[in-house]
């Protein structure tokens, strides 16, 4: 998206909606498309208690693996976490426009602004 995100898409880059992978330079970590193209599915269950429980341990947690189950007493649908925001973000349903932005989404959701977030471990690089 070109213009003043998220208010004005001028389409100067030729992409009114989705942009092909690697349309923009990698970030300082060598990662592409971490925010703004599509929301990215993660393998994490949406559990409103998980991070509060971690914080209550008063210790540094390195690479938390996420909750074992979904939990939200206000919504009984089982949900996974999506991260990063998309080209369709607006103030009405995007809390922020950053890589760590997260939302709960039904596991059977299929939208053009949902994709996958893949990861690579050091062992996979070797």
Which residues fall in each region the model found?
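Surface-exposed recognition segments
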Residues: 5-19, 34-126
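Short, small/polar residue-rich loop motifs at catalytic or cofactor-binding pockets
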Residues: 24-27
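Cyclic nucleotide-binding regulatory module and flanking cytosolic helices
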Residues: 1-2
């Amino acid at each position: 998206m070109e213009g003043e995100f998220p208010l004005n898409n001028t389409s100067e880059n030729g992409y009114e909606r989705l942009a092909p992978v690697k349309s923009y330079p990698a970030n300082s970590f060598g990662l592409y498309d971490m925010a703004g193209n599509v929301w990215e599915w993660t393998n994490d269950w949406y559990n409103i208690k998980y991070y509060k429980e971690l914080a209550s341990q008063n210790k540094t947690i390195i690479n938390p693996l996420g909750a074992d189950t979904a939990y939200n007493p206000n919504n009984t649908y089982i949900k996974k976490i999506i991260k990063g925001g998309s080209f369709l973000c607006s103030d009405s349903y995007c809390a922020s426009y950053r890589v760590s932005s997260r939302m709960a989404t039904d596991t059977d959701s299929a939208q053009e602004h949902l994709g996958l977030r893949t990861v690579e471990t050091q062992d996979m690089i070797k």
